Amino acid sequence: MKIKDYAVDTARAVAFLSRLPMPPALFNGYDGRLNRLVRAFPFAGLLIGFVPAVTLLLLLSLRTDPLVAALVALSVQALVTGALHEDGLADTADGIGGGSSREQSLIIMKDSRIGTYGAIALILSFAIRAAALAAIIRHSSPLAAALAIPAVAALSRGAIAWHWQRLPPAKPDGVAASNGQPNEAAMHFALVSAGLLAALLIWPPFGLRPLVAGLLVAGVAGFAFTVFIRRKLAGHTGDTLGATQQICEIATLCALATAL
């Protein structure tokens, strides 16, 4: 693998996963497929996560209440990503909660309107993540708490690669199908790099126990959700990819907060 190719893939992944602007020249000749970009998702998540991390650090330096600082940082993160993953979580919750069959669930997930299940999922996602991040703030230094954001961002986007590669497209004509499916090499690279990036950011400030807890819980959450979606939808969609990220982020933040 060439470093230049990986750098280009990372920039393209950042552009796909967020609203951060990237140089247009990087997209010359690019066909828009994402199957190779998946390998760069964790590092792209790391870069995206630094924006809310800096926000959190600034707020804590002003002695902002931990819960308020956590909520603002998560709001900034949603602005940076365009709430891409939150949208997937809401649509998946609506589809699974409101659909009595696989076909009906997929139809509901395609509807852009948010339903009761989606609204509840979004509220719980923000509430649980904010509470967990506030707990991390209270039991660690401001810098350590800030570093947890890009660490979890990298780890949760590595989980997307697992979900995407292990499940076929639920709809042959869907957006996820048109983007291609990652091969095992790209998936393995994403998982290993996600774990290494998380270790670099979590181990020094928090220690070994929170790191192990975060890695284990993220892995179990991603695996369990993938099995659940296989049974419910028999394949992945763009929405379930976003939901995977959200579920793993929630689970990892809770694991870190509990292990401190």
Curated annotation (Swiss-Prot):
This protein's UniProt keywords: Cell inner membrane, Cell membrane, Cobalamin biosynthesis, Magnesium, Membrane, Transferase, Transmembrane, Transmembrane helix
Protein name: Adenosylcobinamide-GDP ribazoletransferase
Family: Belongs to the CobS family.
Top-level taxon of the source organism: Bacteria
Any Pfam family matching the protein: CobS
Keyword Endoplasmic reticulum part of the UniProt annotation: no
InterPro entries documented for this protein: CobS
Known role: Joins adenosylcobinamide-GDP and alpha-ribazole to generate adenosylcobalamin (Ado-cobalamin). Also synthesizes adenosylcobalamin 5'-phosphate from adenosylcobinamide-GDP and alpha-ribazole 5'-phosphate.
GO molecular function: adenosylcobinamide-GDP ribazoletransferase activity; cobalamin 5'-phosphate synthase activity
EC class name: transferase
Subcellular locations according to the entry: Cell inner membrane
Catalytic function, reaction form: alpha-ribazole + adenosylcob(III)inamide-GDP = adenosylcob(III)alamin + GMP + H(+); alpha-ribazole 5'-phosphate + adenosylcob(III)inamide-GDP = adenosylcob(III)alamin 5'-phosphate + GMP + H(+)
Any single Gene Ontology cellular-component annotation: plasma membrane
Transmembrane portions of the chain: 40-60, 64-84, 117-137, 142-162, 188-208, 210-230
GO biological process per UniProt: cobalamin biosynthetic process
Membrane topology: Multi-pass membrane protein
PANTHER family: ADENOSYLCOBINAMIDE-GDP RIBAZOLETRANSFERASE
Pathway: Cofactor biosynthesis; adenosylcobalamin biosynthesis; adenosylcobalamin from cob(II)yrinate a,c-diamide: step 7/7
This protein's record includes keyword Hydrolase: no
Taxonomy of the source species: Bacteria, Pseudomonadati, Pseudomonadota, Alphaproteobacteria, Hyphomicrobiales
Cofactors demanded by this protein: Mg(2+)
Enzyme Commission number: 2.7.8.26
